[in-house]
Regions:
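ABC-family P-loop ATPase nucleotide-binding domain
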Residues: 1-5
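A structural signal for multi-pass alpha-helical bundles of membrane permease subunits
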Residues: 6-10, 15-281
Length: 281
């Protein structure tokens, strides 16, 4: 028995190699973030007269002040992005939960066919839909408007529906039957039993949706190139307005990164739980 344990034990040099490899990968990923953060606190004069890798001396908020009060109007871009994210998260989450519950727990003709057809839309590249969606929004007079940005993508996501359906199907049928016998309707079962049990996967989907919409560039750039701008489009506009003044661009990048890092820290436990549950199931 002891010999089998010793054979199954990983050699120390193998464990050391794994940790060294992971540390190196983490270092490579963190370096660009640190570089961006350091440059954001340099004044344009400091950046021009010193190495890009030198620490700011002294740290300056000039770049932040410039982008928040300049012609790009970065403050409005922050507000617009927050509104887009909130509307997208609420719209996608509510519609995805309802659709997933219907596909998982409600019997109706053609349920499996409709589900797989809906899931098949994941295979369609987003770039293929850009021109049809733009023409539809333009016909409705929604180009260069807030609703033009959110309307095409505010409803159920196939990816979210698939994950939620798999999670909902893991709930024992006996619990659903007991709630039905007690007089609970479908909506009460959904929001009193199914949703609370599925909190880890829902939290993960919220984080994925927030990150996806916060970083969205192609569609907002096409449908609302001038106004209203989101953070990514406003950051790109900084390069042309200020002749690629990199301290301004890095200040904008820092503003965009901080909320995502904070969100990850808050939702980290739920993400780990979701991954663990997915692995068990």
């Amino acid at each position: 028995m002891s010999s089998s344990k010793s054979h199954s034990r990983r050699p120390w040099w193998s464990t050391l190699g794994i940790y060294v490899g992971l540390s190196l990968a983490a270092f490579i990923m963190v370096i660009p973030l640190l570089f961006s953060f350091v440059m954001a606190f340099k004044s344009p004069q400091d950046f021009a007269s010193h190495s890009p890798f030198a620490l700011p001396s002294p740290p300056s908020l000039a770049s932040f002040q410039a982008i928040l009060t300049g012609r790009v109007n970065f403050g409005d871009a922050i507000i617009t992005t927050l509104l887009v994210v909130v509307v997208m998260v609420v719209g996608q989450l509510v519609s995805s939960v309802l659709a997933a519950y219907a596909f998982a727990r409600i019997e109706f003709p053609g349920r499996e066919v409709i589900f797989w057809l809906f899931l098949g839309t994941m295979m369609i590249p987003a770039s293929v839909l850009v021109i049809p969606l733009y023409l539809m929004m333009a016909k409705m007079g929604l180009n260069n408007t807030f609703w033009g940005i959110v309307l095409p993508f505010v409803f159920a996501s196939p990816y979210a529906v698939f994950l939620l359906r798999q999670s909902f199907r893991q709930i024992p049928q006996e619990i659903i039957d007991a709630a039905t016998m007690d007089g609970a309707g479908q909506m009460r079962i959904l929001f009193s039993i199914v949703v609370p049990v599925s909190k880890p996967i829902i939290s993960t989907l919220v984080l994925i949706t927030v990150v996806s919409q916060w970083n969205s560039f192609m569609w907002p750039r096409i449908i609302a190139a001038t106004r209203p701008r989101v953070l990514t489009v406003a950051t790109a506009a900084l390069q042309s307005q200020y002749n690629a003044n990199w301290t301004y661009v890095m200040a904008a990048t820092t503003i965009a990164l901080v909320p995502l890092i904070a969100l990850f820290i808050v939702f980290q436990r739920h993400i780990v739980e979701s991954i663990a549950l997915t692995g068990i199931k």
